[in-house]
Amino acid sequence: MKIVVCLDEENGMLFNGRRQSQDRALRADLLESVGDAPLWMNGYSARQFADASDRLQVDDAFLQNAGSGVWCFVEEALPPEIWPAVESVTVYRWHRRYPAEVTFAFPDNAWSLQESRDFPGYSHERITKEVYAR
């Protein structure tokens, strides 16, 4: 499973049950990274990908149902039992600080940065894409 998350400067993900932000340039970069493969996510996340609905696999239990090598866009806390199936983590960083109730953390130190690059966002001056693997 290839997990994709969006984080603020404090690794925040959600505030009051809602995503902190979104950016169309980020969505375009993610869809380019995924290629022809489906992008799995829940119904809440799918609303921001309406223009690419034919490329999505929408399932509110997607983390339990997605298999090996599958791309998963995650906007909620990752259940601990999912981590053994995670092969890579792509982090998009907003370079802003937002209020957050849910934060992201790797479960251990087995993850190393494989790639990092900045690109201009649509509503964010700069977004950093980081790819981690075990």
What are these regions (language model features)?
Residues 1-134:
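Enzymes that bind and transform nitrogen-containing heteroaromatic metabolites
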